[in-house]
């Protein structure tokens, strides 16, 4: 049995997961709500946050029951760090393929389009059932210092009077960090709340340092390991 699992905040990784599930003729399940049932091949799709794995992804991989694993990470054009090797280290499953794909950046409000052609060799290799060794990616030594806190300091989530207290942001937050449109200290700035709000009552405001960073040079490199 093959199953695609994903974590997605603003929708970029969800779009990739749904594409892969369609190509593999299986379903795509959210990591935060997926049952821990054994599968033969798991395809894990997730975003890179501050060169790190989101907490939801770490928790999921630690409990994953799969013989084989393929990893697909999305990043917004800045450094993806060492996320594939770090993800592989959290599970006993044998990794047979890995890819890091540039997509739109959630902090910039960019759409979920991606280059599907980049997945052709990734998909072709899933039938091999041959374990690979992932290389260590370059990672800023300071990226592990409170990444969620740095995101919260650099990016504010604002609530307008359009909020009608529907509670969607509260119930759909993967970190249980939203209370009536106001983020708590558990927020990782995945921006799922902003993307799902039916009233468009939530918006973001980046600080000066983050705006400078987001205006920097971006990469369109695809990292492929098969």
Question: Residue ranges of each PLM-predicted region?
Answer:
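Short, solvent-exposed beta-strand edge segments and adjacent coil->beta transition regions
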Residues: 154-156
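A generic structural signal for alpha-helix starts
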Residues: 8-11, 78, 164, 188
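FMN-binding flavodoxin-like domain, especially the glycine-rich phosphate-binding loop
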Residues: 2-3, 10-16, 22-152, 205-208, ...
